[in-house]
Amino acid sequence: DCEQHTDCSAASGPVYCCQDSDCCGGVDYICTNYGQCVRHF
């Protein structure tokens, strides 16, 4: 179970994501299968 979500207010940036909507930056970012947000082009 994934309970850690991205904290968009953290200066260090995203922590963990469970789904794409957890990512900061909108549709430009996706949640990878290892729980980090990455930008896709």
From Swiss-Prot:
Tissue: Expressed by the venom duct.
Localization annotation: Secreted
The keyword Secreted is assigned to this record: yes
Principal place of residence: secreted
Coiled-coil regions, chain positions: none
Organism: Terebra subulata
Posttranslational mods: Contains 4 disulfide bonds.
Record-given protein name: Augerpeptide-s11a
Keyword annotations: Disulfide bond, Secreted, Toxin
Lineage, opening ranks: Eukaryota, Metazoa, Spiralia, Lophotrochozoa, Mollusca
Domain-related comment: The cysteine framework is XI (C-C-CC-CC-C-C).
Any one of the GO CC terms: extracellular region
A GO molecular-function descriptor: toxin activity
Superkingdom per UniProt: Eukaryota
The protein's role, per its UniProt record: Does not elicit any observable symptomatology in C.elegans.
